[in-house]
Amino acid sequence: MKYLILILFFVSCSKAQEKPSYISFKLENDSIYVFAKNPVLGKTFLKIVDRKTKTEKFIDFNKPETLKVLQFEKTKIDTLEIVEKYQFSLHYGTSVFKEYDTLYNYGLPFLKGKRYKVLQGQNSNFTHKGDFSRYAIDFKMNVGQEVCAIREGLVIKVKEDSNIGGRDKKYRDKANLIIIAHPDGTFAQYVHLKKDGVLVNKGQTVKKGQVIGYSGNTGMSTEPHLHFAVYKPTKNGFVSIPYILDSIPTKRYKKGKFARNK
């Protein structure tokens, strides 16, 4: 199922009186300095948009760090006006994305010898539509089945505290998940995991085929399954991409077909 939290993994400032938690101010002499903090282990970038002129500025973070991103004369503007004037949003990845490895052969997200049915393939009529979820695949998996990393990488986000789910959009942010950054700058997400069903930690390096968690039915989900996709970062957030899965292009994983990890 579609899981939108990755488009912006921090909500941008939408109300004039609100300030994102990763933005801070420092008053020094005659200036106001705006700082942004990258709170995750992987690469991120800050997008700053002038609400009036629509001009954009991008700041890249290569590690957990705090950087000065703007400076103003305090006689001309105050902190409230800064938040009113600019929209801040923080995204995974880099603002200038290099070409990814289109020929990489990803592994199936389950153990060797296992066989699962495709519940929903790419670009389908239910939830795998639009740039974010077009190339996602759902495998029908009972609760508690082993989920494996489809590629080696760095774990940058985990969630496993939810025990609820359903069809309604109100459950969208209740999905347990794992996000892994790959060496070529792409990302994979594994969604709808069971409560306390994550076996890896943020900052941990995982190998291809390693068991990283257990399938479930949390979040916006109508039945137990594993939703996963591969993404590239863009200046407007994550975009799902086609890829090769167990030597087969993702477009050939159709609803009702089975995949076996030999």
Residues covered by each model-derived region:
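Surface-exposed, glycine-biased beta-strand/turn segments
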Residues: 64-174
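Short, acidic/hydrophobic/Gly-rich beta-strand patch recurrent on exposed beta strands
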Residues: 137-138, 177-183
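Short histidine-centered loop motifs in beta-beta connectors
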Residues: 186-209
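Bacterial Sec-dependent N-terminal signal peptides
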Residues: 1-22, 36
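A structural signal for short beta-strand/turn segments enriched in small hydrophobics and glycine
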Residues: 147, 153-155, 203-215
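Beta-strand-enriched, solvent-exposed domains that form extended recognition/catalytic surfaces
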Residues: 17-96
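Active-site loop architecture of trypsin-fold serine endopeptidases
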Residues: 164-168, 215-227
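Acidic, glycine-rich catalytic/binding loops that coordinate metals and/or anionic ligands
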Residues: 106, 168, 199, 204-207, ...
